[in-house]
Amino acid sequence: MNNDSQQAAHEVDASGSLVSDKHRRRLSGSQKLIVGGVVLALSLSLIWLGGRQKKVNDNASPSTLIAANTKPFHPAPIEVPPDTPAVQEAVQPTVPQPPRGEPERHEPRPEETPIFAYSSGDQGVSKRASQGDMGRRQEDKRDDNSLPNGEVSGENDLSIRMKPTELQPSRATLLPHPDFMVTQGTIIPCILQTAIDTNLAGYVKCVLPQDIRGTTNNIVLLDRGTTVVGEIQRGLQQGDERVFVLWDRAETPDHAMISLTSPSADELGRPGLPGSVDSHFWQRFSGAMLLSAVQGAFQAASTYAGSSGGGMSFNSFQNNGEQTTETALKATINIPPTLKKNQGDTVSIFVARDLDFFGVYQLRLTGGAARGRNRRS
């Protein structure tokens, strides 16, 4: 009997949950209605509280009413100073004064309208001034483009570009003494008699290996063996690979001297003299590289002694090493490169101005022409 009662107690209700027991019972219909009513009441109360809070916030913010500008905005008129009026003999009519009893009506000015509510006074003034300037510029532009007959000028960018640059004419002249002149642009070869080292400024010397004739190629003006003296005014700078030599004067074997003042060139006429360039790389960076290596060694040692008592001394030496490396690099980084050119190398002189030998040489008949002249005489 007891077993039957226990089995009946543990039987599963067919319409209930599979895991239901005596401690879990289904809700009746009235209980479901009560639970639904409670949930609905809580939802309505939350909605009501939220709407009330929003209403309080709306009431707390002050409402500012800004008068709308119903009239169209018109910029302030530009005051143009009137021309000096002619003297009028007629009596100016008197303007009737308004009666005192009636107060004057206050017409709002443009700057007092609500459109200027959030603009400062300076901004309004500058805006009116800029509008006035723009109007004047447009009027001036219209006046410039207009002709007396009301026609529009045809000047535009294309017509301006079509006007060529007018240059002064160059008049041709004849050389006064072409037989005795070496004209500008002549390239004279020369053999160096002194080696070149650009560490210091100084003088150089070269000798002409051949005769240099005049423009007509009839008379030798600079004989073979003429010595030319030049000067190196300064050395090279970083990145330079050529040295500038200024040739001052030439002296012929017959002791005729002439001032050249012409620059140097290579065999092909390129400016400057090439040579072997020493950039002094190791002199510039060897000290800094050595100090950097020593500093790196001490930095590696400081990592092993990081927590020991000697860590402070390693850091102090490292900081001093960085300053020493920077000082050494500044002292040697600006060493200029040096160009060296050997004695006996061929250089050129680019004649920069006409050389006139008329006051030095004279022409005379020689050989058969002179004998024929004597027989005729």
Swiss-Prot record:
It comes from the Bacteria. Coiled coil: none annotated. The keyword Hydrolase does not apply. Residues 92-161 are annotated as: Disordered. The chain crosses the membrane at residues 33-50. Residues 101-112, 134-145 have a biased composition (Basic and acidic residues). One of its GO terms (cellular component) is plasma membrane. Its main location: membrane. InterPro entries: T4SS_VirB10/PtlG, T4SS_VirB10/TraB/TrbI, T4SS_VirB10/TrbI. Keywords: Cell inner membrane, Cell membrane, Crown gall tumor, Membrane, Plasmid, Transmembrane, Transmembrane helix. It is a single-pass membrane protein. It is found in: Cell inner membrane. Belongs to the TrbI/VirB10 family. VirB proteins are suggested to act at the bacterial surface and there play an important role in directing T-DNA transfer to plant cells. This is Protein virB10. It comes from Agrobacterium tumefaciens (strain 15955). The gene is virB10.
